[in-house]
UniProtKB/Swiss-Prot annotation:
Bilayer topology annotation: Single-pass membrane protein
Disulfide bonds: none
One cellular component (GO) term of this entry: plasma membrane-derived thylakoid membrane
A Pfam cross-reference name: PSI_PsaJ
NCBIfam families named in the record: PRK02733.1 (NF002743)
Organism encoding this protein: Thermosynechococcus vestitus (strain NIES-2133 / IAM M-273 / BP-1)
Protein name, as recorded: Photosystem I reaction center subunit IX
Main location: membrane
Similarity comment text for this entry: Belongs to the PsaJ family.
Keyword RNA-binding: no
Amino acid sequence: MKHFLTYLSTAPVLAAIWMTITAGILIEFNRFYPDLLFHPL
């Protein structure tokens, strides 16, 4: 278990998890409010 936690705390793994969560939030936001991500200038 200690080695698994060490693996999870490495930078590439944390970056992948963070990008996955961010993409999920953006996808769900875009699903409910499809016009708010692209504001006309």
